[in-house]
UniProtKB/Swiss-Prot annotation:
HAMAP family: Ribosomal_bS20. The gene is rpsT. Keywords: Ribonucleoprotein, Ribosomal protein, RNA-binding, rRNA-binding. This is Small ribosomal subunit protein bS20. The lineage of its organism: Bacteria, Bacillati, Cyanobacteriota, Cyanophyceae, Synechococcales. Binds directly to 16S ribosomal RNA.
Length: 98
């Protein structure tokens, strides 16, 4: 443990930031998983309510990824890669003819 007051504060700040970053990363992973399950549900039974659920979950995932990038939790390229993979899965499962 640090002895200097400023070093103690930095340790506390680093722990606070670690927990905040962990929460953001966990939320992004959860929303991405929800998107994939919504894609599969729509592919199995395409209907209007399933399509609406897909659009809502995709929008929520994009939003959370963008916020994580904006706050420095994810690197910009990592956020772009996650969004591109979601878009690719969306076009393969939900909208194959487009």
């Amino acid at each position: 443990m640090a002895n200097i007051k400023s070093a103690i504060k930095r340790v506390q700040i680093a722990e606070r930031n670690r927990l905040r970053n962990k929460a953001y990363k966990s939320a992004v992973k959860t929303l991405v998983k929800h998107c994939f399950t919504a894609f599969d549900a729509y592919a199995a039974d395409p209907n209007e309510t399933a399509r609406q659920a897909v659009n809502e979950r995709l929008s929520a995932a994009y939003s959370k990824i963008d916020k994580a990038v904006k706050r420095g939790v994810l690197h910009a390229n990592t956020g772009a890669r996650k969004k591109a993979r979601l878009a690719k899965a969306f076009h393969l499962k939900v909208d194959p003819q487009a």
